[in-house]
Amino acid sequence: AFPKIIDNNNFFDDLDKYLSDHFIFRQDFREVKGFVNYNLFNISINNKVTIKDDCLFELTETNYKSLDNIVAKVDEIITRFDINDYEFIAIPLKNHYAGLDNVSEEIDEYLGVRMDNYHSLKDLLSLSDYYRTDIHLKQERLGSVVSKILELCDVEEKDIEYSFNTYDKFYGSLYAKMAISMKPDTITYLTNDLLNSIKVYSVEDKDLLDVYNVSELESLDPYSIYLNGPKAYLKIVNKNVEDRKLIIFRDSYTSSIAPL
């Protein structure tokens, strides 16, 4: 929506974002620029995104200040709420499996000596578990991750059957940044009677939501189908399990893991 005119400095920032998003043929022009840079000038990096073997990667560096903030925040939560039983699980960056950098290794090394109960999932995943045009993991490839989490939580794993629902026009966040023509990914979301019956309460919106918001598949960010995207505080109620509670401090990677 066009930004409201109010007496503060945010209007022009919002206007700039609005015009950028509503510029006619904006993505087409970006793809032409990306095509010329990549195919004519052999420039394989655009907006800190590069391509290797028909797969897009976001170039990054280890931010030790951010890691220190994570350690401090975890310590604060543990102390404030007197938590004794917790696990810290790190999902590796996709770059790790393409040998583009050592960021995941540096994160594991740094946090591994500063945090108790730190677990890396590097050995459980591979490049094929990630989308080609996005940074995230494919939900249908998360079996080993879910098994590891259940093991850490001392919960018996059960055989659960899912229906596989697919959408074959998923262009991830890295696609828009790289701005070159590529085949889309296929995004899959798993359902069964249990997941269909579960409701997700959004504290910030004060609303009951479904586990999957299928309408998001037609949005600019189809990955938001999982748990309705970047919500700050969600409560998932499973009436079949009343004697256990799991609290997750998450980022977007966990959106597709938590329902499982």
What are these regions (language model features)?
Residues A1-L260:
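Extracellular glycan-modifying ectodomains
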